[in-house]
Amino acid sequence: MRTPRPLAPEPITVLDLFSGCGGFTQGFHEFRPKGAEEDGPVFHSVAAVEHDLAAAATYAANFGSHRLDKTLPAARVHLEDIESWKPSEEALHADVVVGGPPCQGFSALNRHKKGAERNRLWEEYVRIVAKVRPKVFVIENVDRFLKSNEFHNLLSEVKEGGLLSEYRLVDPPGHEPADTEDAKHKRYLLNAADYGAVQARRRAIVIGVHQDVDSAHALKYPPTTHVRRSKHSTNASAQPLDGIEMGPSLWRAVDSVFNESKRITLHGTELPDSKDYISEVAEMVPGIFTTRDLHFGRNPEALSRARYKAIPRGGNRMDLRNKWYTVNEDGGIQIFDTPNPPGVETVVRYLSTDSWDNHNTGTGDVMGRLRLGEPSVTIRTEFFKPEKGRYLHPTAARPITHYEAARIQGFPLDFRWCGSKTDIARQIGNAVPIPLGTAIASAIHAYLRT
């Protein structure tokens, strides 16, 4: 008589705060233990809180009432400011709380006073963790968070008398007893490329565990699965030898994304004309789109088109120095090394700017091409503007598309999106890279289930 297969344990429940479109949740839902890759999810998002309507609609389209995967109950999506949110019944039973309090206040890209006000949102995260009392909490943020007053306040909250005194912070990877405080804090920085992302994106990841959790072992940060290629390494050196177990793989290059996108037609400059009613936000919103719908272009001015054409592989704004261009009657662009090309009767214009020409250092990524053979730079919310960073296609005369940015972040082809082009770009750029979220999920699963 066949022995019946034991019932799988109940999924580990997750509450996602400042959830955005659900990148962190997607990473957790994608995790499967080794040997159970074909089984159902082991993590289940029960609730999410997000104040942005389009992002909340996207979350609902993937994990709420409009989700395609019905193997798990729908997450409750709360569209409201977190300051006024009181944990709902399902949230009060979450095993894990994850979230990244809005990071713009900590970011070097935002030095406005309003950033300081947004930094206080981390206190709301602490308030909710103290109320829910999960087994594990995870805070994700930019690297500057580790030097902020808010981080030091967090360290105080886990001490006796603090709101989180029932918790202890997990030592960061590589921590040594001899580390200085500053050295220890730097170890909280994880690079998504070390965990299989095709993007070099460093994020502060701070994990806390409740002192009453009954586990056979301590929670540890996930081991890295990929390492940066040394300057002297070759592809051949990465090939495994028979009978010899290899260590981590080399960082994944962004090439796979562009090999994929070149097989898809670049369709127009707009999203499909589609709207849907999302009950969680009680509105008709643009969508529901899939990642496949996001491969559209832009309508750049002639100057931008000329710059895209003139910048070589691996190049950036510095390659525009001493370059001029003309626009033919048919709209064609010609590039010249002189302001007075012989036989040219159309107006000749300079490609660079005085500001760019006068600065040999800094902003090296401006108007830069992504490099083949390497991971992408960090995908931010305005990746569709090469003036903002290294966001030109590696070889084509255009910026990367929303599709390519989403795939660089690790979103699956069937991920569902709501909102305008700008809304979706913001959702993509603010998300936690999916492979990084999955790696963190693996460490939590090992702690709670093995």
Each language-model region and where it sits:
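Generic recognition of flexible, low-complexity loop/linker segments
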Residues: 2-4, 193-194, 363-368
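Short alpha-helical patches at coil-to-helix transitions and adjacent helical residues
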Residues: 21, 151, 203, 430-438
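C-terminal target-recognition/interaction regions appended to catalytic cores
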Residues: 272-450
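Core alpha/beta nucleotide-donor-binding catalytic domains of modification enzymes
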Residues: 2-136, 143-156
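Intrinsically disordered, low-complexity acidic Ser/Thr-rich regulatory segments
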Residues: 6-7, 41, 176-186, 355-362
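Extracellular structured ligand-interaction cores
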Residues: 11-14, 201-205, 374-376
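A short, structural micro-pattern
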Residues: 43, 198-200, 373, 402
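Class I S-adenosyl-L-methionine
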Residues: 87-94, 106-353
